Amino acid sequence: MPLYIYTDVYASGSVPRGWVPTRGGTVKYPVRNPAVHRYLRQLLPGRWQKVIKQGNSGAVHYFEHASGQVAGVKYYPN
């Protein structure tokens, strides 16, 4: 499945409009899968990291570039 780059998680269309991130509910770590990391760097060269954000109605998982752009946004309801 190809990954697309968006300006933010809401622009992806995967996150519901009422979703609000919880304070202190963010985990960021390096992309561990070498194939995915290589693919992301082909899309946009630079530093990428995996982000998991907890929110009021579920969690959002995505890859974030150093510029703030995101890819591979997935929403998991509670």
What are these regions (language model features)?
Residues M1-N78:
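Catalytic toxin/effector domains delivered as secreted proteins or via bacterial secretion systems
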